[in-house]
């Protein structure tokens, strides 16, 4: 009869069965074994707990049940007979059989009672009926099956189908370990007075009463005194829990109503294993009858089948040939063998002796959760049901967490739905047993990008915290009834947006506390995310002083009049939340679970992030549709608060969450998305954004829009660099594309791309003109921004953003610009330095001349990383590289904004470092409208050769040109604020600064070039405006605009000094002797790159001069820039570009380092450089 651990005779030391399941079968079935010995007349107010007196005299004379007197436990579990009035009989059968709550207990420890019906299926199993008494004889090896003897015979039954006759589980009202959300789900469809007693899942041993009344479920803690008595109200204490339930079934005594009807146990517990002797996993293929196909996956297909031996419906997963190794397939089965949880799909067996291979699991009739949510009746699947589903998944993942398993593919499509909304996590194809903190996937592994954590995308490393990230996305799927995450956002954009702090917006009707949990799961740093134990606890404590139905109703602007509220109804007004009180006077408020939180406003603190606004169109929004804060006048001032509610006391998660701000995402060299592939689309502004409220995003990403005035043009955004800045910096230095501006919008200038602007700023696509047909999109800059290739009438509107949100409101003007032809014959897409190329010069095109040229010298760092920098041989003294000019309309009287060097953050933070693969052509002799200049509104009809100088209120001088030099292109009389843009086409002839990474001679040492200076004292402390302009061939040319620059890593020159152009600062520029040849594409290969990396690694281990190391490093960068496009997988490309960025920064540090050459271990700069080279090699070898 199977293997036994021990034989149980008359000895009192009975081995206890395994833990019971938390749910049982539905209503008790009538049994006609015996009639009630004493017929009774039942009155109208019938209560099943009031008819117990006659059971006290019933004494059990024997086990076999052949005595006429009968035993009290057996009588307790049979329904009323025909001598009871029909109404009373129907109620008794509906809610449960009559129970003896006050009778004597049994003294036989081996006497058990059946909790559920069980039908024998062979292998010496025994059929039992609910309420039947049994004597346990022993258990099988794993304790999952018990050998019992009843009056019908002897055999095996599941251990979790029986319980000791004196245990609490024999009572119909006791449900064992049940979560709070599961209790609300079980009671949600019942009537007033329905109740259950449960043990808290999060606090074992803590019992509670869950009672439904008037559409609300109330939870009462059952307290225990020192002498072992239990009570709900301190005045009424009892020796046993049964006495307590009997008391409150007759009088409310502090409860909202009396306990009338025990909630039925809806689901039988899971039976692990199909029989007591089936302990081998290999199955006979002929035992399975295959039926229809359910679906297919990456490695195989899933069918419905029947296990003929047990007449059991199963799910059969087959393996496609040549798609997975047999060992990998068996690993999935091995993982499933180790896990046993009510909310994890159970493995039944495998067929691996010959192909095709099978994995046989339990069958879930309602399919995957994703399709179920999309097709369900939302009036039936209410917010209570959704919360119940999420709690089950959280419980399953907490179990995996304790077992050190990671799932790696947690999503709604991989969860299955059964009867009574039971959800089980399935698809363990990627699951792994964790032996350390993280697991690194093998090369070529595929993962769903929108569900995968950022660290997993970048480094292929997985942990339980990466599953927590996926669980947050799964919550979002549940809250939206199966919507696809990141709607309208391409896969290539997801990491890019996440890195900048973007997170999905709060779904319509989603309670703020649930959204807080999502945002906590989406913390950038894995250490800052909660564990699954904490998320499970969060669901237990989420709605102490309210119900989720009421929260959803308030979110949707509806009165919480019923519990059946559809939690996803768009565009309803949001009503202010208020603290809810009980609908009936409750005398025992201190014992209601969560009563200590009754004074807290659970919904008063609004969830952070973007709040819902007008519905987005059916296009592809890459920014949230919710662009306005729920409290328009509120401005979040602390970035630490952006992931939680303003009031931490009211936040459900604050009791155990780490109060840490997520670290700033690492800045990469370039965007992970490819350049725009639709150059023909044009955009123009159509929206009005005068009422956009101040926003602050999570993870340290903050920005504040300019305030609109009646006479100001609505603000517009353009693609610049992304940099992180403190909000409202009073220093307000000059602003460049890399975030040198003192706060304000400067932190997000790189956040808007044409695809993003199209949806969020009301852009509409226009038709290209005939002259634009040949135009090509310009490669994206190193700051992850990009510009569209053209606009109607060859015009593009650009926006210059305010430098400081506390300074005077600056007028934002639109600047006319045309698309530029990208440099020809460029093999590397990210080379940010200009390249001398005679044949690459584009034909001159008629364009308006520059109107205002800022004058002044510029302090430039060594080896400037940008490509928009060029100095001609004919540059006059005092003319350097142009920075950024802040010159709003009326600047003389309003004070203007300070000028500073473009691209150098004042606070020392480095912007995104350029990748050595983007082409940045140099300037033509004709004016390019990508570089806006200032127009003097007062100078008209001035000869072209007359140079006039304008000075603002701070003493900054600007070169003014007459208006007739500008062709009519709109907005002639408005001054422009100069902002660095994407680089223009190359000129026919120019002497350029050559990037060392493209030098053919690595030993060549460039000479130094010092930019001339022409400075003017400012009125605020003698700081100088570091600005320069480059006239070309004596003509009135336009300023050369440098892109964002990385500050010097030296102690003598601070970024703040460079940004403000401190007097006397002169920084030498490296200039090569001659233009170098690029490495041809056919010479770039994986082997060549690894060989170059090994050469640099070898050089680092020997005492060689720094200059030699720098030259070797630049040669490696040259190979990397050409090899990046050869990497097929986006995830590996992410990590590769980030490693190249680190290498380039390390080379910059080494170049300016004054430390003597050494070996790694003694020089930290060399250590960093060696780690970067090793990281590049690792990524390439994946």
From Swiss-Prot:
Catalysed reaction, written as an equation: L-tyrosyl-[protein] + ATP = O-phospho-L-tyrosyl-[protein] + ADP + H(+)
Function: Non-receptor tyrosine-protein kinase that plays an ABL1-overlapping role in key processes linked to cell growth and survival such as cytoskeleton remodeling in response to extracellular stimuli, cell motility and adhesion and receptor endocytosis. Coordinates actin remodeling through tyrosine phosphorylation of proteins controlling cytoskeleton dynamics like MYH10 (involved in movement); CTTN (involved in signaling); or TUBA1 and TUBB (microtubule subunits). Binds directly F-actin and regulates actin cytoskeletal structure through its F-actin-bundling activity.
SMART domains to which the protein is assigned, alphabetical: FABD, SH2, SH3, TyrKc
Residues modified as N6-acetyllysine: 776
Phosphotyrosine sites (modified residues): 116, 161, 174, 185, 218, 231, 261, 272, 299, 303, 439, 459, 568, 683, 718
Polar residues composition bias: residue spans: 780-791, 807-823, 1010-1019
Motif (Nuclear localization signal): 658-660
Family: Belongs to the protein kinase superfamily. Tyr protein kinase family. ABL subfamily.
Low complexity: bias regions: 20-30
Transcription among keywords: no
Gene: ABL2
Descriptive protein name: Tyrosine-protein kinase ABL2
Species, as recorded: Homo sapiens (Human)
Pfam families: F_actin_bind, PK_Tyr_Ser-Thr, SH2, SH3_1
Active site residues per record: 409
Residues engaged in binding ATP: 294-302, 317, 362-368
Residue numbers spanned by region Disordered: 1-47, 60-80, 611-641, 654-674, 763-794, 807-851, 964-1024
Annotated transmembrane regions: none
Region: F-actin-binding, residue numbers: 694-930, 1020-1182
EC number: 2.7.10.2
Upper classification of the organism: Eukaryota, Metazoa, Chordata, Craniata, Vertebrata
